[in-house]
Amino acid sequence: MDELVIAGRSFSSRLMVGTGKFASNSLMADALAASGSQIVTVALRRVDIDRPEDDLLAHIDRDKYLLLPNTSGARDAEEAVRLARLARAAGCEPWVKLEVTPDPYYLLPDPIETLKAAEILVKEGFVVLPYINADPVLAKHLQEAGTATVMPLGAPIGTNKGVRTRDNIAIIIEQAIVPVVVDAGLGAPSHVAEAMEMGADAVLVNTALAVTPDPAGMAHAFRLGVEAGRRAFLAGLPAQQQKAEASSPLTGFLRDEQ
């Protein structure tokens, strides 16, 4: 399968994985391995980046995975920027998944504060991957600001509802000049396959892997879903049509039709 390229860096996997909600860190580590992922997101508020022996970080091989700190929990641009700076000061690579979610109930991203934070972080040399509503206009503004990707939500975080924002994501993909990563709400392998079939460059999944009784098994299923969807997109899906069209001749063997 072709490689994903973000900010000049190549990845063989198009499945990114989050580390929250797992029943144990060993289950999380097994899921990461089964997923084939190379990019792993970690909420900065959940770990002590300064301490590699932190139990969560001890289960993530930093030579194998790109550790992508995220600013989950930030309510405005100021908090998000502060979290990103703390991660870089602690020795993390200057990559950040930018999340600004002032509403703790629906966890929908704040477009104004997200754009504001992105502009600051890009100027400071960060590789910024912003989590956003599926808003094509905002996506264009973020790309113009210099973000490395845009990450529109399929559905609200943790809802497992799938690609509910399909029409807007299709517009974002059509207009994108950076990779489009569908993030949030993807609860089944069929959901990630759908996103990849649409032409998304990658997907990010967490809850669907963490809450299942078999995280590693589900991670492997999602891996296959991503690969199937990407291969289908590259091969070229047939156009949909209203009228039926037979795949084999209907005449000439039972009767002749004029």
UniProtKB/Swiss-Prot annotation:
GO molecular-function annotation terms? Answer: thiazole synthase activity
The record's top EC class is transferase
Q: Where does 1-deoxy-D-xylulose 5-phosphate bind?
A: G158, A184, G185, N206, T207
Give the subcellular location.
Answer: Cytoplasm
* Coiled coil (residue ranges): none
Q: What EC number(s) does its UniProt record assign?
A: 2.8.1.10
Annotated keywords: Cytoplasm, Schiff base, Thiamine biosynthesis, Transferase
**SUPFAM superfamilies, A to Z:** ThiG-like
Spell out the GO cellular component terms annotated for this protein, sorted alphabetically and separated by semicolons. cytoplasm
Q: Where is the active site?
A: K97
Which reaction(s) does its UniProt entry say it catalyses? [ThiS sulfur-carrier protein]-C-terminal-Gly-aminoethanethioate + 2-iminoacetate + 1-deoxy-D-xylulose 5-phosphate = [ThiS sulfur-carrier protein]-C-terminal Gly-Gly + 2-[(2R,5Z)-2-carboxy-4-methylthiazol-5(2H)-ylidene]ethyl phosphate + 2 H2O + H(+)
Give the chief site where it resides: cytoplasm
Superkingdom of origin organism: Bacteria
Name its pathway: Cofactor biosynthesis; thiamine diphosphate biosynthesis
Q: Which PANTHER family match?
A: THIAZOLE SYNTHASE
Q: How does it assemble?
A: Homotetramer. Forms heterodimers with either ThiH or ThiS.
| Family (UniProt) | Belongs to the ThiG family.
The role this protein plays is: Catalyzes the rearrangement of 1-deoxy-D-xylulose 5-phosphate (DXP) to produce the thiazole phosphate moiety of thiamine. Sulfur is provided by the thiocarboxylate moiety of the carrier protein ThiS. In vitro, sulfur can be provided by H(2)S.
- Name-wise, this protein is Thiazole synthase 2
Q: Which species is the source of this protein?
A: Syntrophotalea carbinolica (strain DSM 2380 / NBRC 103641 / GraBd1)
